[in-house]
Amino acid sequence: MKSVFLCEQADNISRVYAQSTVSLLKAEAALEAKVYTKRDLTKTPESFKETEYIFSSWGMPVLTADEISAYFPQLKCVFYAAGSVQSFARPFLERGIKVFSAWAANAVPVAEYTAAQIILANKGFFKAAQKMSGGDVPAAREAFNHYSGNYGAKVGIIGAGMIGKLVIQALKNHRLEILVSDPFLTDKTAGELCVKKCGLDELFRSCTVVSNHLANNGQTRGMLDYALFSSMPPYGVFINTGRGAQVVESGLARALERRPDLTALLDVTDPEPPESGSPFYSLENCILTPHIAGSSGNEVHRMAEYISDEFLRFKKGLPCRYEVTLKMLETMA
């Protein structure tokens, strides 16, 4: 067999790979429809000696370098129809096997979701809706009056990777002043994006809405703390669709308790979901969602389409767009 599906959760393969994509890969990559697991590798290791390409999605098993050498001596590439490859990619890359990810495809719905929240946040939607739904019409109107709308509002973007850039692009038709904190953002790219570079202190102090898109690694863990949250302007809104580990959650909870004017929109936490008894469940100014920003429903088909297109580009010797390198693992989510 030349290509195989390898995934611990077969349902994810059938959900992400539309039948049209599977048919294309059967024809172009000699892909077998069966979904194999790590257990299959150990039971019949000889079956994979000729495999050149692995296709996967959420549930890709973690393999050591020795296991990769033993099971897949002819392997050239892993095509991953999902976002982060941090959990499994390094041993493949260290053996010279190329890894491609649909991180760019998964970034699209996250950026759409975030941009929508930013627009609503600047209109005072979350505070006003909460008061209005509780039957307090005067309080709803009073809350709404504290927000200046989107015209000329300052929005802070933390991290200008793929998602951060897409959020900025999604907001380009609105007259917003966008500040970005990202040590890897060059002056040239900032100019092209029409954004202002700044540090975290200035960003939190200046922006009515702040959205986190930091890469998830040891360097960013606990980077967003009480001092930053408590410095936000009156009626500021913090949006997190990145990772919960980047937030000192006790500090955020304390800021929300002491500053009821603030609002936090948390699609991610650490742990996820929050533990029983977490103040996030009881704080009126904290809105939790169950990690819904990323690809869902029919949106997941986009990831497999990106990956199948990437395979065709590789096969034809064309430049590939979504290859992940060891260097990229240092800064990618």
Model-derived regions: residue spans:
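Rossmann-like dinucleotide-binding domain for NAD(H)/NADP(H)
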Residues: V99, P234-A333
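NAD(P)-binding Rossmann-fold cofactor-contacting core
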Residues: N173-G191
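Glycine-rich Rossmann-fold phosphate-binding loop(s) that bind the pyrophosphate
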Residues: A160-G161
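Phosphate-binding beta-alpha-beta segment of Rossmann-like dinucleotide-binding domains, i.e.
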Residues: A102-K154, Q169
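Phosphate-coordination loops involved in phosphoryl transfer and adenosine-cofactor binding
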Residues: L75, Y151-K154, Y226, Y235
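Rossmann-like adenosine-cofactor binding region
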Residues: V62-L63, L185-P279
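An N-terminal-biased, well-structured beta-alpha scaffold segment characteristic
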Residues: M1-F100
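N-terminal Rossmann-fold NAD(P) dinucleotide-binding loop
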Residues: G164-K165
